[in-house]
A protein has these predicted regions:
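N-terminal Rossmann-like NAD(P) cofactor-binding subdomain of oxidoreductases
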Residues: 2-208
């Protein structure tokens, strides 16, 4: 009682109909820092109510969050409209690499922070790839990126791929002991491509037990 209640940052999820977008919406439900105010996806999904659109497309075992169902999905390519009124977007869209780079930069130029789940910008020298517990200092490179993009507040930051984020924290903890060599073997889940066995039947006979 009487405690200060922090105002949450208004955000959009771009790519809200895909598997990663769905997972983001679950994670963002009742989030203490972020308030989802917009959902965006492909032109084919635009103008439809999210709950109706996803009735037979929801892929997660967890139920679709109630708060998402009444959102009218916007066209992800309508950058100005989606960016209006939000400070940050989570981006998880399926596009050609060049198109994706252009889209994320367009959002950044609307002065919003773009947190990307995509690989397109991961190799850019001035786009930080962050594991917060390990290399938060890399965010300093954002100033260089802003100069390139001509922005004051907008920038892009990316998350690493699923393999890197699984083992790098362990290596970081052991770094002081002087690791000289490491042997790594990763096994990629088909869910990483946003698909399931039901949607990818050719994979069923392509698994070595």
């Amino acid at each position: 009682k009487g405690m200060y209640k922090m105002e949450r940052t208004k955000i959009a999820v771009v790519g809200a109909t895909g598997m990663v977008g769905q997972r983001l919406l679950v994670l963002l439900e009742n989030h203490p820092y972020f308030e989802v105010v917009k959902l965006a996806a492909s032109k084919n999904s635009a103008g439809k109510k999210y709950g109706d659109l996803m009735e037979n497309k929801w892929k997660l075992d967890i139920k679709m969050p109630e708060y998402t169902k009444d959102f009218i999905v916007e066209d992800a390519m309508d950058v100005k409209s989606v960016a209006n009124g939000v400070k940050l977007i989570f981006c998880a869209v399926n596009l050609d690499k060049k198109e994706l780079v252009a889209l994320e930069e367009a959002y950044a130029k609307e002065e919003v922070v773009v947190v990307s789940n995509n690989s397109a910008n991961r190799m850019k020298a001035d786009v930080p790839m962050i594991i917060p517990e390990i290399n938060a200092k890399h965010l300093d490179i954002v100033d260089v990126q802003r100069k390139r993009l001509g922005t004051k507040k907008g920038f892009i930051v990316v998350k690493p791929n699923c393999s890197i984020q699984s083992y790098v924290p362990v290596f970081a903890a052991l770094k002081e002991y002087g690791i000289k060599e490491a042997s790594i073997c990763t096994y990629q889940a088909i869910s990483g491509s946003g698909r399931t066995f039901e949607e990818w039947p050719e994979m069923v006979e392509n698994i070595i037990p």
